[in-house]
Curated annotation (Swiss-Prot):
The gene is matK. It is found in: Plastid. Usually encoded in the trnK tRNA gene intron. Its retention as a freestanding gene in this organism suggests it acts in trans to assist in splicing chloroplast group II introns. PANTHER family: MATURASE K (PTHR34811:SF1). This is Maturase K.
């Protein structure tokens, strides 16, 4: 018996093809409209912060940017003991993304349309990825939604870290009792001790300072406390995600590492803490003795050179700069501009470190690779090209050896809390507004 196959579409079925094309066109129009409106809301919110709400940003004097990650690691990690390495969950429900926008977008029609679009296309978005996770980089509107979702998480998490006694939910009752315990001790001790002495004694019973910084999915909590203190925060984080975002947070996504025994990676920085013993010969009243001093030193490795070699092929296996065949067809100024762009991005990324040997090596490799690429394009040797194109080589040198003050300005502040500098906790954030990708 003959049965029609609905999956075979003949070329004469113009009506079906027309509807299919229209459906795809309507989908793209709706997607562009939703993205434009969401960007407009983000833009209005940014303008309101820049014009009328500057005080809210100025009050947070302990904010830090991406350029201060290196000084933070070099200056503070020698005094810290444990870190909590955490990954933000990728499996996000579509309704949670809409709910994060509901607090600052009052247009109900837009929210309903966005919810309708996400519910109809969420399965196709998830199924595009082999592991079933939510990757916002593949769609602009999903990137905006994911950023708002992370922003909402951080605003609640930082509030929980600073003023956790405001929460009345069951998982944080123990934290509430601990803070009330500190208040009771303060009332008992104040009549007998001076305020300064009490602040010094309060440091012994209060939890030590807790540093927080994040990049993309990964965020790190660093502390001077014991492993028991970090285990408490591990439980707090798991309960936090499950309670406020209805997400099943796996404990294997959180790692407690001791800095003296382990290393960690963030922002492609490979950091570890080493102890260097030193022996000093001292003499008091004609009696010499040897004192053994241990100095903690933070070692930061930036494996950026190998990644550039694998992707762009700027140098060979022996480490010698080579010409790039993929850029020979471009103009001279385009080749120079692209390599300058690569170096500028790397400089903005790595210039916070006091050890810039790898950065200077990258500058040398990119400069010689650019000269050899230009010489190969003009079918001459490097020496002949440099002699014939003196003006072009001078412009190339000016681009690579621009003064550091023209590119970057760093400002460091010492932040002290209400305890007069005894208890210091800092929140590190990344303020990248635009990214120029590597050529």
């Amino acid at each position: 018996m003959y049965k029609q196959n609905l999956f075979i579409i003949s070329s004469n079925d113009s009506k079906y093809n027309f509807l299919l094309r229209n459906k795809k066109l309507y989908y793209e129009i709706i997607l562009e409209g939703l993205t434009f409106i969401l960007e407009f809301f983000f833009f209005i919110r940014l303008i309101s912060y820049l014009e009328g709400k500057k005080n809210k940003i100025e009050k947070l004097n302990n904010l830090r940017s991406i350029l201060s990650i290196f000084p933070f690691l070099e200056d503070n990690f020698s005094n810290l003991k444990f870190i909590l390495d955490i990954l933000i969950p990728r499996k996000v429900h579509a309704e949670i993304l809409v709910q994060t926008l509901r607090y600052w977008i009052k247009d109900a029609t837009y929210l309903h349309l966005l919810r309708f679009w996400l519910n109809n296309n969420w399965n196709s978005i998830i199924n595009q990825n082999k592991d079933g996770y939510f990757y916002p980089q593949k769609n602009k509107i999903l990137l905006l939604l994911y950023n708002s979702y992370v922003c909402k998480y951080e605003s609640i998490f930082v509030f929980l870290r600073n003023q956790s006694y405001h929460f009345r939910s069951t998982p944080f009752i123990m934290l509430l009792e601990r803070i009330y315990f500190y208040f009771k001790i303060e009332r008992l001790v104040n009549p007998f001790l001076k305020v300064k002495d009490f602040k010094a004694n309060l440091w012994l019973i209060k939890e030590p300072c807790l540093h927080y910084f994040r990049y993309r999915r990964q965020y790190i909590l660093a502390s001077k406390g014991t492993s028991l203190f970090l285990n408490k925060w591990k439980c707090y984080v798991i309960t936090f995600w499950q309670w406020y975002f209805s997400l099943w947070f796996f404990s294997r996504s959180i790692y407690i590492k001791k800095l003296l025994n382990n290393s960690f990676e963030i922002l492609t920085y490979h950091s570890s803490l080493n102890i260097n013993p030193s022996f000093v010969l001292s003499q008091i009243l004609e009696t010499p003795f040897i004192s053994n001093n241990t100095i903690k030193k933070v070692n930061i490795l930036v494996p950026i050179i190998l990644s550039i070699s694998d992707k762009e092929k700027f140098f060979n296996v022996l480490g010698h700069p080579t010409s790039n065949l993929f850029r020979v067809d471009l103009s001279d100024y385009n080749i120079i501009g692209r390599l300058e762009c690569i170096y500028r991005n790397l400089y903005h990324y790595l210039s916070g470190s006091s050890k810039k040997n790898s950065l200077y090596l990258i500058k040398y490799i990119l400069l010689l690779s650019c000269v050899r690429t230009l010489a190969r394009k003009h079918k001459s040797t490097v020496r002949t090209f440099a002699f014939q194109k003196k003006r072009l080589c001078l412009e190339l040198l000016e681009g690579f050896f621009i003064s550091e003050e023209d590119i970057l300005f760093l400002k460091f502040q010492k932040v002290y809390s209400s305890l007069g500098g005894v208890y210091i906790s800092q929140f590190w954030y990344l303020n990248i507004y635009s990214i120029n990708y590597l050529a």
